Amino acid sequence: MKRTQLLLFTCLMLLSWPQRAMAELQTAVFAGGCFWCMEHDLEHLPGVRDAVSGYSGGQLERPTYRQVSSETTGHQEAVQVRFDPDQISYAELLRSYWRNVDPLDGGGQFCDRGDSYRPVIFTADDAQAQAAEASAAAAARELGQPRSALKVELRQAARFWPAEGYHQNYAENNSVKYN
């Protein structure tokens, strides 16, 4: 009887563990120019479970790439990152973000120009907002600039819409362009 109870308890623990682990994942959303590049740079960080290219910040529901790139929807190309905070902190994701954008350029990023390529950190809650502001202040200090010189916008998270399938994992699916 004890052996059966122990076996049953072990099975229940094994079955419930992945659900608990999945429930502990957190989400961050970053816009920083072309989502292909941002997705590629963030998804390989230890502790990041997945990164999805998409759109955030605009008014239109279920926007398409064509609509967003027309610069009429208010959306930015963005990446939604699901991460394990026991393996990588939101602050570490922010440090990676700042290394992958030009924080002094609010008109797009690098060769990608326009509102849909504007750098934005979308914050999900007060803790993320405080961490994002602290990271912006640190980035400004590191650059020797006043905080007001940074053009990365910090905004409350808007609805995130995944981009079309051909945009997902673009760097891996087009390795000739990304090696």
Task: List the predicted regions and their residue ranges.
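N-terminal secretory signal peptides that target proteins for export/translocation
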Residues: 1-2
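Short, intrinsically disordered, low-complexity terminal segments
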Residues: 18-20
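Bacterial N-terminal signal peptides
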Residues: 5-16
